[in-house]
Swiss-Prot record:
UniProt family annotation: Belongs to the F420H(2)-dependent biliverdin reductase family.
Any GO CC annotation of this UniProt entry: extracellular region
Phenotype when changing R21A: 2.7-fold decrease in catalytic efficiency
UniProt-recorded Gene Ontology molecular function terms: coenzyme F420 binding; oxidoreductase activity, acting on the CH-CH group of donors; protein homodimerization activity
This protein's name: F420H(2)-dependent biliverdin reductase
Keyword entries, A-Z: Isopeptide bond, Oxidoreductase, Secreted, Ubl conjugation
Subcellular location: Cell surface; Secreted
Assembly notes: Homodimer.
Record field: catalytic activity: (4Z,15Z)-bilirubin IXalpha + oxidized coenzyme F420-(gamma-L-Glu)(n) + H(+) = biliverdin IXalpha + reduced coenzyme F420-(gamma-L-Glu)(n)
Superkingdom: Bacteria
Primary enzyme class: oxidoreductase
Organism: Mycobacterium tuberculosis (strain ATCC 25618 / H37Rv)
Impact upon substituting R112A: 2.6-fold decrease in catalytic efficiency
Amino acid sequence: MAMVNTTTRLSDDALAFLSERHLAMLTTLRADNSPHVVAVGFTFDPKTHIARVITTGGSQKAVNADRSGLAVLSQVDGARWLSLEGRAAVNSDIDAVRDAELRYAQRYRTPRPNPRRVVIEVQIERVLGSADLLDRA
C-alpha cells in the first residue's frame, strides 16, 4: 500500500482509473462517530483535487458530511484501488449541482431529475492506493 498527500501527483493510470465507470464506497461519520458506508458514483477533478457525489438533500450521507466535514471515497477493481480522503461540504447552489450532474453524466449516465439534489464536495487531502497508481516522483 502506498500513501501520498495531494502534492504528489496521481499517475496517468490513476487518473484513467478515476475516469472509468466504477462505483465507490463513500464513508462518512454518523453522529456517534461510527462509519456510514454506502455505494456511490463520484467524479474527480485532478486540477482542483475535488471529488463530487450527487445525492438528495437530507440523505444520511449528506447529513453526515455536513455535520462532520469528513469523507473518504474508496474505489476498487481487482488489484487496483484508491482511497481519497478529505474535507467534505454539502453544496446546494444550483450552478454547483448542475456542474456536478454534468460531470456525473460524463462518467456514468445522465442522472434522473431530482429537484432536491445537492452535491457533496470532498477536497482531497490524502490518497492511499495500490503502488502502481501513485506517482511519487
